[in-house]
Amino acid sequence: MEVIRSERAGFCMGVALALKKLDMLVEKGGHVGTFGPIIHNPFVLEEYAMKGVRCFGSVQAVKEALEPFYVFLETIDEEKRKEGQLQLNLLIRAHGIPYSTESFLRNLPHVQLMDATCPRVKEAQNAISKATQCGQGTRTLLLFGDANHPEVDGLVSYAKGKYIISPEPEKLIEYAKKNPGEEMVLAAQTTQDRAVFDTIKKALFEAAATQPIIWAT
């Protein structure tokens, strides 16, 4: 049997950038961790775990990891502090994290936070934040995606008002039909099918009494 490897096989741009940033932190030394799995690949995660990289699944886990830093704060001299021995170098996963979580982590003492969110995901987060703000009011976000996916957790956290998530186009279209006077923003999880997204976009234009604001990821 002949096995042909696609020329495009390998990590996507966002994942490749995230791993590059993580490699830089590992080479630098010190305490290194990621908030959430850096990517969804158990073999890669195991490789980094063997290098001493910790994967934190919650803010509480990060706070618990910092406790030894606080306990020995008074016994660590200034030189060691400058060398980063009293610092956790924490990398945000490629899928991104919720806005409130990122803000909290940035304000934690002894945490140096580095953002490894995929540039396309970060662009989507910022666009959702901007598009869902309407003067003093807000617009409803219709998100085409999987509610259980970590990227989606981050995306909807940037919505200024309410949001509807569904991987089923019909449900998003149905919501628009039932709320014709409501201003809406359409966005998608970055891994969703563009052709299906365009179908939803077209249907929303036809269904809404007032044209919804459309934004595509």
Regions found by a protein language model. Give the residues of each.
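The feature marks the mature, well-folded catalytic cores of soluble enzymes
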Residues: M1-T217
